[in-house]
């Protein structure tokens, strides 16, 4: 094999994607393999200047160095994967959980779900909820990275208790003066410090609530109890203990409620396209209740009885409001618009049943047993498909700004009645909590990419990666998976 430089600038710099030989390596001679014969070749692809390329090429033109690097890479992942191994009769579950779901989670924590081979993306930095969700998946395999991400999120928390939905951790780092020009991002991001700290009306109401569980999981997994009392700055100035950051988050959600005691959706909740015109979110109220339970567990462990008792009373109030306002005969509604219309009711022609609110009613423990069973029965009846669970149904077809941008999304895609992967595990966990393991496994196998490899002409995506969504039944491409790795499902 002869090395061929990619066509580009004379100094081996950036290349043009439209150039005829862009991203192509060609063999200088034909390679013939006889039956059973093996030959080894070293294939190199990288980016950098000419000098860096020479150094790397020289090092890895040696098979011994290549083998050593490969062994180091193997050992690196073996150490991580060995922290959690399962053995079940389900081959797909074994393969995914023992290797690929951890790998996907590690990648997401590293790149905050914006590293993709197929999507350019429109952001840079850390997505608050994404990073908080991903951090809680790796305390056993990568506690250092888990803690780093948690501290960055704490730095990105405003003292009032809400997170900056998208921020760059470098904003809050003390940097030495440099004469070098800063990197010019192609993505539009806040350019002045005053633009970086948005007000509560632009906060996503669920963002910081995820961080409560991330912190508790980190402490439980590592035993790093002292972390709760570490002093960490706020995004808008001042500093406090990690423990007090958590209290600020809970207090913010307690304050940001509508007339009926249900948490306001603010800019949006987990479903960015369903903002209910700034109304109230059932999912966030259940998430608030769940975060309260996590915090109470930590407060009791730390013998901070007064805090534990206070937040138990808050939790009782949240649970009562959810029971009073969100139950609709057979399932939980999704929310209430700013104009007071309930969304996700039996009377709705579109968006009748939603996955998030029903799964979280059960997961949080806010639903009593009978309602929990009915809610998950509704999920099975209305939302289950052979490829996974729909986010909602029937799909929206009529634009309605009081509900949100979801009503303008093409039916069966993304938030509008697609099989959005991330909420599917919430349903698995909810069924496990109800003691209905067979239902959980039915849902698991439906979404599991391993079991979809024999229908690759439909799925069109890797058999080892959960994708952001699978096209729903209201679309002609029902079953097609899109945006691999761009999801928290792996956790």
For each of these PLM feature ranges, what is it?
Residues 1-35, 94-98, 105:
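Trp/Gly-enriched beta-strand surface patches
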Residues 31-49, 288-291:
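Short Pro-Gly-centered flexible turn/kink motifs
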Residues 46-90:
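Terminal connector regions
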Residues 50-55, 221-235, 292-312, 434:
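Inter-helical turn/loop segments and adjacent helix faces that build the functional surface
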Residues 71-122, 148, 152, 252, ...:
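Low-complexity, Ser/Thr/Pro/Gly-enriched N-terminal "stalk/linker" regions
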Residues 116-125, 166-206, 235, 260-281, ...:
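Carbohydrate-binding/catalytic loop surfaces
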Residues 126-131, 135-261, 282-289, 417-440, ...:
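Aromatic-rich carbohydrate-recognition surfaces in CAZymes
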Residues 164-166, 287-403, 444-480:
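Catalytic cores of carbohydrate-active enzymes
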């Amino acid at each position: 094999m002869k090395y061929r430089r990619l066509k580009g600038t004379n100094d081996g710099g950036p290349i043009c994607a439209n150039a005829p030989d862009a991203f192509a390596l060609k063999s200088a001679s034909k390679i013939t393999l006889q039956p059973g014969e093996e030959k080894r070749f070293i294939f190199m692809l990288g980016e950098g200047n000419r000098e860096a390329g020479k150094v790397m090429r020289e090092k890895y033109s040696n098979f011994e160095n290549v083998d050593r690097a490969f062994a180091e890479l193997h050992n690196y992942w073996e150490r991580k994967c060995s922290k959690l191994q399962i053995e079940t009769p389900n081959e797909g579950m074994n393969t995914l959980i023992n290797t690929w779901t951890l790998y996907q989670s590690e990648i997401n924590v590293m790149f905050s779900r914006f590293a993709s081979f197929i999507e350019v993306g429109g952001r840079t930095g850390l997505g608050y909820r994404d990073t908080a969700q991903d951090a809680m998946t790796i305390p056993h395999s990568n506690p250092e990275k888990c803690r780093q991400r948690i501290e960055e999120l704490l730095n990105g928390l405003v003292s009032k208790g809400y997170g900056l939905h998208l921020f760059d951790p470098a904003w809050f780092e003390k940097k030495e003066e440099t004469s070098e020009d800063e990197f010019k991002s192609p993505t539009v991001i806040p350019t002045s410090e005053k633009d970086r700290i948005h007000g509560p009306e632009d906060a996503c109401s669920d963002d910081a609530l995820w961080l409560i569980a991330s912190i508790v999981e980190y402490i439980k997994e590592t035993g790093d109890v002292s972390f709760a009392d570490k002093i960490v700055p706020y995004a808008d100035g001042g500093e406090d203990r990690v423990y007090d950051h958590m209290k600020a988050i809970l207090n913010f959600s307690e304050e940001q409620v509508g007339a009926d005691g249900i948490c306001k959706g603010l800019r949006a909740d987990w479903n960015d396209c369903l903002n209910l015109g700034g109304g109230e979110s059932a999912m966030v109220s259940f998430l608030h209740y769940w975060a309260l339970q996590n915090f109470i567990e930590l407060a009791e462990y730390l013998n901070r009885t007064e805090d534990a008792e206070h937040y138990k009373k808050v939790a009782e109030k949240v649970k009562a409001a959810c029971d009073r306002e969100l139950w609709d005969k057979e399932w939980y509604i999704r929310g209430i618009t700013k104009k007071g219309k309930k969304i996700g009711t039996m009377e709705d022609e579109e968006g009748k049943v939603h996955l998030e609110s029903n799964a979280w009613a059960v997961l949080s423990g806010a639903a009593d047993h009978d309602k929990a069973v009915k809610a998950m029965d509704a999920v099975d009846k209305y939302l289950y498909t052979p490829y996974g669970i729909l986010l909602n149904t029937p799909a929206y077809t009529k634009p309605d700004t009081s509900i949100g941008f979801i009503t303008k999304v093409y039916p069966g895609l993304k938030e509008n009645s697609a099989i959005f992967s991330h909420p599917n595990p919430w349903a698995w966990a909810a069924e496990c909590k109800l003691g209905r393991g067979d239902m959980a496994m039915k849902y698991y196998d439906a979404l599991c990419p391993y079991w979809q490899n024999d229908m690759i002409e439909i799925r069109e995506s890797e058999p080892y990666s959960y994708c952001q969504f699978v096209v729903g039944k209201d679309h002609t491409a029902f079953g097609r998976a899109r945006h691999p790795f761009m999801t928290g499902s792996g956790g």
